[in-house]
Amino acid sequence: MVLLPLRCLFWGSLLTTVYPEPRTACREKQYLVDSQCCNMCPPGEKLVNDCLHTIDTECTRCQTGEFLDTWNAERHCHQHKYCDPNLGLHVEKEGTSETDTTCTCDEGLHCTNAACESCTMHSLCPPGLGVKQIATGISDTICDPCPIGFFSNVSSALEKCHPWTSCETKGLVKVQAGTNKTDVICGPQPRLRALVVVPIIMGILLVVLLVSACIRKVVKKPENKVMYQDPVEDLEEFPMPPHSIAPVQETLHGCQPVTQEDGKESRISVQERV
């Protein structure tokens, strides 16, 4: 009875030695072929032949324009990425047998996804928002609202929020408060404002007076010319009639008019004198 368990143990160990269990897993950087672990090909190389009991795995280098970037058992290499200029792409870094080509977008554009297969325009931050992070070839613009004390009045992919103007540092007073879209408006202090406004008003009044004086001087010239015209010229323009040289004298005689004839002396009788 004691020998039976010993016999079972003996035959079990013998069968295990003759018929070993097939492998189901291999070490890192190995792959399983027909229950045998073969070494993988390194990056930049592809598989040509699997290993045998006494022969190691056969690999060969990827051709130009191809690559494999990991340890592998691939029989074909991958083609390098093509950076299509029609999509706004250009080569940022040339590919090798171990790495793929890196594409990036032209200026003002960024990739639409992680693979950078196409490009799109950078976003603009509208008024009230400033640029927190400038866009790159692989990322879009990041905008941030302008906090209190700052403003942005343009749409831009570069401009950050600007601080409000400090009126006090300029010796001015605040006329209008700022917002996230507009700057503070400054103005002169009341006393300074008067010193500025009064000379301006005086200057305007002086100009008005000078203009008025010039206008009056121009208007008076023709009037003076008429008032002091040469009398000889008037006579030439308007000659006197011939009978007006020696007008007929008239006297009264007994309340009756007496006409003095031309060429005779005028005499009055004694009675008339009395």
UniProtKB/Swiss-Prot annotation:
CC per GO annotation: CD40 receptor complex; external side of plasma membrane
Subunit structure: Monomer and homodimer. Interacts with TRAF1, TRAF2, TRAF3, TRAF5 and TRAF6. Interacts with TRAF6 and MAP3K8; the interaction is required for ERK activation.
Its membrane topology: Single-pass type I membrane protein
Side Extracellular, residues: 21-194
Name this protein carries in UniProt: Tumor necrosis factor receptor superfamily member 5
Major site of localization recorded for this protein: membrane
Transmembrane parts of this sequence: 195-215
CDD domains, per database record: TNFRSF5 (cd13407)
Disulfide bond positions: C26-C37, C38-C51, C41-C59, C62-C77, C83-C103, C105-C119, C111-C116, C125-C143
Organism: Canis lupus familiaris (Dog)
Cytoplasmic side: 216-274
Keywords: Disulfide bond, Glycoprotein, Immunity, Membrane, Receptor, Repeat, Signal, Transmembrane, Transmembrane helix
Molecular function as annotated in GO: signaling receptor activity
